[in-house]
Amino acid sequence: MEGVEPLGEDLNLLRAFYELGVRSVGLTHARRNAAGSGGIFKPSGSPRDGLTNFGRDLVRECERLGILIDLAHINPRGFEDIVELTSKPLIVSHTNARKFYDIERNASDEQIKMIGKRGGVVGVNAILVSPDPQTSTIDRYVDHIEHVISLTGTDGVGIGFDFCEYLFLQLPESVRAELAAKLTTPHFIPDLTNHSHARNLTRKLIDRGFSDEEIEKNLRDNWLRIFKETL
């Protein structure tokens, strides 16, 4: 579940979704809701408030039930609140390193370290790798992977492609312009836009000197580990 709007402010609905099979919850998207506020697609300016009382209760109930908490879209203060309120591994399912693209939607070095210390996984996103279309490449994508590894070790990184160019291209030009003004202009990696392109990433990881074991961890094993440990 990405954004807990379907719950309103009713924890009983969280339990109902759990019974229906939901095992991972991200509290917000890039907006405010009853649980907290999302991080914006700019270097600063996200709401400074943390989780609401409902959001804090929700986090505690997720941990009690065994629902994996995803911090991909939460604002910086909400991120800190979730870390403080929990003890189990956490994930950021699809993000990038602010070192290469400095927006609050991406993860700071300190946030990446928090996830690593908890035994969680940071999934690297195939969209927000660079503010410049010329450097939105698979090489820059691998730069993000290497940076996360430098902060968490090889067990702390995964793939979080978030492929959505096909959706973006279906939108009218006016809607694309509105999204660009409100969020940011996405720069898609030309040879990494759908799942059939995953082999291009594997080839690049080999070219960049990753071992077979490291590649397997990046592409599969780290996610499998966290799912087995927490779900």
Where are these regions (language model features)?
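Active-site micro-motifs of SAM-dependent methyltransferase domains
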Residues: 97, 165, 225
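Extended, charged catalytic domains and RNA/DNA-binding interfaces, predominantly
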Residues: 1-131, 144-150, 156, 177-180, ...
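Short acidic/histidine-rich active-site segments
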Residues: 126, 152-176, 183-185, 190-191
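Soluble non-cytosolic domains of exported or imported proteins
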Residues: 53, 73, 106, 135-139, ...
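Charge-dense, low-complexity intrinsically disordered segments
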Residues: 45, 49, 135, 188, ...
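Short aromatic-enriched loop/helix-cap "lid" or pocket-rim segments at secondary-structure transitions
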Residues: 39, 170-172, 230
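Mid-to-C-terminal alpha-helical segments outside catalytic/metal-binding sites
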Residues: 190-231
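A general structural-boundary detector
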Residues: 49, 102, 185-188, 202, ...
